[in-house]
Amino acid sequence: VCTYLRSNVALMKKMIEEGYQDPETLQGRIDAVNEWLKDPKLLEADANAEYAAVIEIDLSEITEPILACPNDPDDVKLLSDIQGTPIQDIFLGSCMTNIGHFRAAAEIWRGEKFNPNVRTWVCPPTRMDQDKLKEEAVFSVFSAMGARLEIAGCSLCMGNQARVPDGVNMFSTSTRNFDDRIGNGAQVYLGSAELGAVTSTMGKLPTPAEYLAVYKEKVAPKKDEI
């Protein structure tokens, strides 16, 4: 939470620097967030709170990626259940991504060959992230992979700037995969940026072993930098 809030503070400061029309309001938010960050406390339920249900998940038992399947965000399956599914389009973007996701994808793609059978779309959520990625030369990796570089914003997540061809299988890092949202008849799988990057190079959903091998080799050693 603190990491995201610090990122938001940086964004608001940049907006003020670029001439935002109501700087006092933004500065007030900046001050309030910074004050909370000095002693961060999350909301807690009352001791006598009653719950409709309690769900406990042992994260140590989750040993592979979980994806939302076409075309329902609630229809989730393990990667091993759908491995090998051919994918024609990859979308790395939406407001659920942050700059670290793009850095991780670039590490996975670095040194890989362009896959002509996959259309890869890259769209940072904010111009601040977009500019930073350009400064870090991350965009050059995307270009080498033949990615379509979208203007920062929604892009394919809403299907309002562009759409994929009819009936394709697609992997997206967005949060919604409702029927025809991104393309007519498109079958959309939702998952992480790292898994999307591996899928882009292979043209299909990898096996858990294939994915983890790439992640451990290319991403894990640089997790502190990413």
Task: Please provide the spans of the model-predicted regions.
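Fe-S-dependent hydro-lyases/dehydratases of central metabolism
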Residues: 1-226
